[in-house]
């Protein structure tokens, strides 16, 4: 079990055939009974400043966006948390898409793995930072968000410090408090849009906290 776990999470293997430190019979049994779902980069768009935008295909053919943002002192992964979005912010293109489903923890994790590989390939350095600022409202996919952060920061996963992870939210008070109670060391970015509540509510329609997927 430990070997399989390491191959899937530490080495990001997408096939049981690669797991050379387990028996051939066990690999055969795993292939016959299980499937390792994984994301695929469907399209890549490169900018003059080095930014790489990926259209990522999920196992059910939905597409989300993941972006590699390079600067002089860091490379940052901007990852998605939902297919579409639970909110309706009138300045955001994603809000025009119906929220189809939440991303699973492994799909969030795989985005980071993919962008880390691109960072190594194109910039010869590993990923240094992660921001949850892609498609979707991260706090409306709360449990899967937390699980992915725990796995990304684990020494059994990518071992990226939680202090280098930013969760961006449009502001769901109940879920912000819940995240604070988790005692994670991640940073929180609040998209305020306006300091005037009436104006803010016109810009971004926040659903009630009861709508949050817990």
What spans do the regions from the language model cover?
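Conserved small/polar residues in nucleotide/adenosyl-binding loops
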Residues: 207-214
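Flexible glycine/acidic-rich beta-alpha junction loops that bind and position SAM and/or redox cofactors
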Residues: 10, 176, 199-203
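Short loop/turn segments at strand-loop or loop-helix junctions that form parts
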Residues: 193
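Short glycine-enriched, charge-decorated loop/helix-capping segments at active-site entrances
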Residues: 96-98, 202-206
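Flexible, acidic/Gly-rich N-terminal and inter-domain linker regions that tether
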Residues: 1-75
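Conserved Radical SAM active-site core
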Residues: 63-186, 196-197
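Alpha-helix boundary/capping residues
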Residues: 11, 33-37, 115, 152, ...
């Amino acid at each position: 079990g430990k070997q399989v776990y390491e191959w899937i999470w530490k080495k990001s293997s997408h096939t049981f055939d690669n797991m050379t430190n387990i028996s051939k019979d066990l690999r055969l049994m795993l292939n016959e009974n299980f499937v390792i779902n994984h994301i695929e980069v469907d399209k890549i768009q490169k900018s003059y400043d080095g930014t790489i935008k990926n259209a990522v295909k999920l196992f059910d053919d939905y597409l989300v966006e993941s972006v590699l943002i390079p600067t002089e002192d860091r490379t940052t992964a901007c990852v998605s948390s939902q297919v579409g979005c639970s909110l309706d912010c009138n300045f955001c293109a994603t809000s025009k898409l119906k929220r189809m489903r939440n991303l699973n923890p492994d799909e969030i994790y795989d985005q980071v793995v993919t962008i880390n590989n691109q960072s190594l390939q194109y910039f010869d350095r590993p990923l240094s930072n992660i921001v949850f600022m892609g498609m979707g409202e991260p706090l409306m996919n709360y449990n899967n968000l937390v699980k992915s952060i725990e796995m990304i920061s684990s020494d059994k996963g990518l071992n990226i410090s939680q202090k280098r992870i930013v969760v961006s939210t449009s502001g769901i008070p109940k879920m912000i408090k819940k995240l604070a109670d988790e005692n994670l060391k991640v940073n929180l970015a609040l998209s305020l849009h306006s300091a005037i509540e009436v104006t803010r509510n016109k810009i971004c329609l926040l659903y009630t906290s009861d709508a949050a997927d817990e």
